[in-house]
Structures are given as structure tokens and as C-alpha cells.
Amino acid sequence: MAIVITVLAYFCVLLLFSHLTARKMASNETFYRANRRSPWYMVAFGMVGASISGITFVSVPGMVMRTDMTYLQMCIGFILGYFLVAFLLLPIYYRYNLTTIYGYLQQRLGERSYKTGASFFLLSKMTGAAVRFFVVCILLQRFVLDGIGVPFWVTVPVMVLLIWLYTRKGGIKTLVWTDTFQTLCMFAALILIICQVMSALGMTPSEAITAIANDSHSRIFVFDDWMSKQNFWKQFLSGVFVVIVMTGLDQDMMQKNLTCKSLREAQKDVCSYGFAFVPANLLFLSLGVLLVMLAQKQGVALPDVPDDLLPMFAASGVMGNLVVVLFTIGIVAASFSSADSALTAITTSLCVDILGRKEDMKLRKRMHLLVAFVFMLFIIAFKAINSTSVIDAIYILCSYTYGPLLGLFAFSLLTKRQVNGRWSPWVCIASPLICFAIDTLTSQYVGYKFGYELLMLNGALTFAGLALIKKETVKYKQ
């Protein structure tokens, strides 16, 4: 009962934020860009939480079981990636005064390339966000809600409805403030869980830091094995490209950054939260090491699936009801701060990029409701499929859609050529399919399994395809 009361109180606070930020008549400009009046430090803090999904909240502590703390190598790459986004991409987005970042493709490559880029974003974001939210719903159902008799078919509609309720008026303006609150809740829950684990281990903070540093799972850097996926340079470069593509070329991740008052403030915002990812993920990984120590101390067998490490202790009640409540708040805060911005970004892209009716408020309201409804249907469909392998395949295939976005933007930025718009959608469809075939064949016949480097190959194939198709004689718009 305490969990239900806590979560309801949490949602009441979100609805209060929504009411306060949308008291005056909220226009489409407010919904899409918050009238470009957002304080950069609020955006920066909220973006840390928005970038950490509920899956991340659960998965990162479990990573130490198999790969120690080597994930921090990728987080170091994130820093360079965010600097590149801040000083290469943001100036372009602000120069063109864009509502959605895909408007740049319209300026540079024409209408069809513009629609293609936006369509790939919509496909990837809707499916990817639904899969992530589905996994979080399953975790909450399995470890918390089943125990108090709440069925899955009630959980999903209620959670999606609540997201729609607090975003329907203020949109991105509301999210700047709610994401700040949710990030605060997430880190408060994380730190309090760490304190509870230290208490169970009988350690002071300084003793815990020493124990973590001396533990075999505290390994961060891998320089000596070039074949390992955890090799520093592979992880570092992957971190750079992941940020450029999955943040810099993603309307969901960039929309709040475009609400800052000026380019300079937006750059401060992006660089600030770029640095924050190293200490943030260090906390998650440190929790993972402490949980492994606790399992050894209590003689508890570690789970076969690393993602179950935190839920095994935090949601099972082994460490008390307080930790269960904290775990619930943490995972809800992390998942909501990701899902709410995804639904807002999808609505924005649909109205502005696909339908071309930026000023139509009635359409925007209908599209926002429709997006929430389709999002709910996707989650229920994943539950009906009830096959981990099928859902994983869907998620992997949708992740391939970021490659064409990388290729489209790289071609636009690095060349002054125009393309034959008739063929650009086919190039963007062919590149992920070729990558999927290459990945399957190399895995089957060579034994090599691509990681994040497949994203770079995908982008390179798209770039090459765009270079091959017939140029149009349209003057490049400076």
C-alpha cells in the first residue's frame, strides 16, 4: 500500500508542475520549443535523467558481473561526443531557427530526404521507446505490482494516461521542469539505495569506496586485448558516435536543448550534462559492485541475468520495504523522464515534419492523444507476443534506423552536393538491410559479432549511396 500511495503522490507532483507551467494559454510554440526561455542549467540537469531510461537504471549495476566497470570507457567517449554535438550540430540548428532538427535536411537535401529522415526517427523512436517502457512495466509488474494485485492491462494504460495528462498542454516546457524533478528523485533513490546496501554490509562511505576500489570488479580500462569488445578504443569511439547519432541526430534528445535562450546557453547545457554522465554511471556501477559483495556476504547466488541483480535485492523486500519504495520511485522516474519526452518529440515531428502543420493547435492535440494511444498499443502488443527473441529482434532492427540519419546528416555537413530526392529513401532503406545481412553473415561464417561499430558502417553505406545517386542542380542554401 505504501508503494501505491508513494507513486500516486509522485504523479500528483508531476501534475502540479504541469498546471504551473501551462497556466497561461499554451501555444504550439510553447509545446514545441518552450518559447525558447528555458534556463540552461535546468535543461542540463533534467537531460541527465531523460538520457537514463528505466532499463539503464536496472541494467548498469548488473554490468559489473560480466564486464566490470569497463562501461565507463564509453562514458568517457560520451564527453567528446557531447562537445562535438555542442559545437558542430547546435550552431546549425540555431542558425536555421529549427523547430525539429530534421528541418535542416529539408534546407540542404530537399523534401524527400527531409521526410525520409523524419520517418526513420518516428519509426525508431516509437518502437524503441515502447520496448524500453514495456521492459520497465514488466519489471514493475514482476517485482512490485503483482504483489499488490494490479494486473498488467491496468498498469500500462494508467501509466501512459498519466504521461499524457501532464504533457498535453505545456509539452516541452512542462518537461524541462518535470524532468528536473524526476532526475532529482532518481538520484535521491539511487543514493539512498547505496546507503542501505552499505548499511547491510556494515561499511562507512570511506570503507565502501576503498572496498570498491580494491574489488576485482573495479577494472575500468582494457588496453591489452584488441579483440575484446571492452577494448578502450572500441568503447571510447563507440561512445563518441553513439552520442552524435542517438543524441545529436535525435529530435527527442535535442528538443529540450533547442529551448534554451541562445546558442551559447545551449552549448553550456550540452557540455555540462555530457560531463555528468561519468559520475552518474560511476554511482550505478559502484552500486553493482556493492550488491555483488552483499550477495557473497549473505551466501546468495548471483542471478544468471545481470539485469536481475538490482531487482533481486531492491524489489524483493530482502532489504526492507523502504528499498522497495526507493527502487519503485527510481525506476518510475527514470522511465517516465524518457517516455514523456519521446511522446512529445514524436508529436512534434509528426505535426511539423510529416504533416507540415506547425501552427495547427487542434491537430497537435489530436496527434498527441493518438501518439499516446499507439504507444500503449505497442506495449500491449509486445506483451501479447510474449517472446523475448522477437522483441529483441524488433528492438535491434529499429536501432539500425540511426545509421541512415548519420549518413544523411554527414552528407549534408561534409559536402555541398545535392541528391536526387527520388532515390534517397531507397538508399536509406537499403543501408540498414545490407548492414543486417553483413552482421548475420560475419557472425555465422567468421564468428565476429558487430557491436556499435555497425552504426558507423551503416552511416558510411548511406553516405556512399547518397554520393552515387544523381545530383540535382539546386544551389546550396547557405
What are these regions (language model features)?
Residues 27-44, 152, 396-467, 475-477:
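C-terminal membrane-solvent junction of multi-pass transporters and transport-like membrane proteins
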Residues 7-18, 82-86, 121, 138, ...:
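Hydrophobic core segments of alpha-helical transmembrane domains in multi-pass membrane transport
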Residues 62, 66-169, 257-396:
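Helix-loop-helix junctions that connect adjacent transmembrane helices in secondary transporters/permeases
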